[in-house]
Amino acid sequence: MKAAVEKLDKNQVLLEVEVEAPRVQKAIDQAYRRLVKQVNIPGFRKGKAPRFILEQYIGKEPIYNEAAEIVIPPAYEEAVAEHQLEPIDRPEVEIVKVEDGEPLVFKARVEVKPEVQLGPYTGLEVERQEVEVTEADIDAYLKRLQERYAELEVIEDEPAAAGDIVTIDFKGTVDGQPYPGMEGNNYPLELGSGTFITGFEEQLVGARVNEERTVNVTFPSDYHEKDLAGKEAVFQVTVRGIKRKKLAPLDDEFAKDVSECETLADLRQDIRRRLEESQKQRVEAAVRQAVVEKAVAAATVELPEVMVERRIDARIRELERNLQAQKMTLEEFLKNTDKTIGDLEKEFRPGAERDVKTELVLEAIAKAENIQPSQEEIDAEIERMARIFRQDPDTVRKNLGDLSVLKYDIMIKKTIDFLVEHSKPVPPREQGAAGETAETAEATPA
């Protein structure tokens, strides 16, 4: 097989491929055997007519076209591999010549990944925040543990206070008319949690069991349901019950109840370790993101529209899956937000362009630095996945197929590792603590 490549405009190339005659003839014979089984020819059993009879009945062109469909796909893949091309779209194929005893010639026009002009990507200055956990962070963490493991005490003769959990019946109206979804019975609501519209929960503070209250609220102007945005609503609320959190004292018994620690001191030390580890992970994630952003910003590349459009489509599909988890269709979301698919595509475009450029730049750096996953790294990742999914590694390997996606993911991770290793840490600017506090850390100690 012979293949020549010509570069065209806008990341397009033209491949001209010549497939050797014996290979073409074999495909023509195979095409005849396929077609003769599909055609009813008078006087012959199906599949038994000689080729010259089939040609008289349907002509040579269908046989040649079928042979081309057999030959061209693998020949195209071979030509792409030979010239180390990276197509990003389906090729436009033109058959130049196909006939008995002659080579098949075809042309394939296809868009390929663009060339990336890399800027500096080593020695990049990246801020690295210090990891620091204070006693106040640990105290706040413990407070959250107290809240989480608090006992609920039934309140009968006292008014509801902020932090209490009230059970309510409620029914709302807008412009004097009931509105779907604005009513409920025996609904548990923690006062001060921000679960309901701003102002709703505050108006229930001081209410007693079986007391009825009229609650007036105004929906935000940017509320997700356009029909309610900016509207005033009136709720008739009946408090059916009140429960108050009873916090356990912070002592050794509390530590034993909520963790595997024997003493409160041990629990505080465990919390410190967890918060420090969480902060380290946040700092490392921030460094990785920053170094990638700088490397990408320093590079120049013409973004292929087909890759951007695919990324936009992927974002819309992800949105649709998230909506389905909330029992909402994409059509309902668009109606509620007064948007169209075109609006979503416009919103998602900047992020899609950023993703595509990041992907292309990281691939170019990996190529420049010859970064590839080793067999040991591939095996280790399969072992890790097997532990997560509680499956045999061979089963995971089989389910992954050709491992191309796994290899790509490892390559990208190693490329980012390379950027971080070759970056230059600099002190952070004065902008407050960067580490995670007890308010945002994971709440359950070992």
Curated annotation (Swiss-Prot):
Record-listed E.C. numbers: 5.2.1.8
Region (Disordered): 423-446
Domain PPIase FKBP-type as annotated: residue spans: 163-248
KW Secreted (keyword) present: no
Compartments where found: Cytoplasm
Catalyses which reaction(s): [protein]-peptidylproline (omega=180) = [protein]-peptidylproline (omega=0)
Known function: Involved in protein export. Acts as a chaperone by maintaining the newly synthesized protein in an open conformation. Functions as a peptidyl-prolyl cis-trans isomerase.
Family: Belongs to the FKBP-type PPIase family. Tig subfamily.
Comment text on domains: Consists of 3 domains; the N-terminus binds the ribosome, the middle domain has PPIase activity, while the C-terminus has intrinsic chaperone activity on its own.
Entry protein name: Trigger factor
This protein's encoding gene: tig
